[in-house]
């Protein structure tokens, strides 16, 4: 793991993590949320990328007024990324149909060289066909991460694969079941938190590793309030 500054919370979220490394659970926010409350509540950011259908996706315009979960990661992340997406999917299943219909889930790749639109779409469909996958040039993705208050992810060292099976890795305990659809054995650093924007277009809470689907589900009705 390499420590890099984050605009949102220099203390609570002061690093990027390489896949295969833990993000420690944090105490519940003082407001009653079940995640971590940023030191400063910021507005929903503005950036334009493209979705897996090749269409321009203006993040602020497309998600305005809706509870929105955002995760920056990559499809060949061995542990944190698939678990985060599975946790969000499980949380949505625990809430009411009305809240579930209002919510949006956006996954932004930090690995544009390997995460093509078909790869990203196939990977996300393991969790939900409704999840939005966003891609772009390295410069566009870097700008989106900075707009969200984090430093851009970068390629890092190798991740061990199973001997004789370069397309498989050993899953850590607690990792959600998932499949990969590209080459393994490498890592890309990324912010290992789920960003949760509310219907008022603010960021009142983020969820690090260790937060459960039930925790996220409990917060969803609050996030959905106008």
Task: Give the positions of each predicted feature.
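Non-catalytic, surface beta->alpha helical segment in thiol-disulfide oxidoreductase systems
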Residues: 204-224
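Short active-site neighborhood of thiol/selenol oxidoreductases, capturing the structured segment around
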Residues: 60-84, 88
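Structural microenvironment flanking redox-active thiols in thiol-disulfide oxidoreductases
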Residues: 83-144
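C-terminal motif of bacterial Sec signal peptides marking the signal peptidase cleavage site
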Residues: 14-18
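Bacterial signal peptide processing site
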Residues: 19-23
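A short, hydrophobic beta-strand/beta-hairpin element that forms part of a small beta-sheet core
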Residues: 192-205
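N-terminal "domain-start" segment that seeds a small globular fold
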Residues: 25-61, 86
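Short, internal strand/loop/helix patches
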Residues: 121-187, 191
């Amino acid at each position: 793991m390499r420590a890099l500054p984050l605009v949102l919370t220099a203390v609570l979220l002061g690093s990027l993590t390489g896949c295969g490394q833990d993000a420690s659970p944090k105490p519940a926010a003082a407001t009653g949320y079940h995640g971590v409350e940023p030191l400063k509540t910021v507005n929903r950011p503005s950036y334009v990328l493209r979705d897996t259908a090749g269409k321009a996706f203006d993040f602020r315009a497309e998600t305005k007024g809706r509870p929105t979960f955002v995760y920056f990661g990559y499809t060949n992340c061995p542990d944190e990324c698939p678990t985060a997406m599975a946790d969000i999917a499980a949380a949505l299943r625990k809430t009411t149909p009305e809240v579930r219909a209002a919510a949006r889930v956006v996954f932004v790749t930090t690995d544009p060289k390997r995460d093509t639109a078909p790869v990203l779409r196939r990977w996300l469909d393991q969790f939900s066909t409704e999840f939005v996958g966003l891609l772009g040039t390295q410069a566009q993705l870097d700008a989106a991460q900075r707009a969200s208050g984090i430093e851009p992810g970068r390629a890092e060292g190798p991740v061990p694969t199973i001997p004789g099976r370069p397309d498989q890795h050993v899953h850590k305990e607690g990792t959600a079941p998932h499949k990969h659809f590209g080459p393994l054995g490498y890592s890309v650093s990324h912010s290992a938190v789920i960003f949760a924007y509310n219907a008022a277009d603010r960021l009142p809470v983020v969820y690090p590793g260790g937060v459960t689907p039930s925790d996220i589900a409990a917060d969803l009705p609050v996030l959905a309030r106008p």
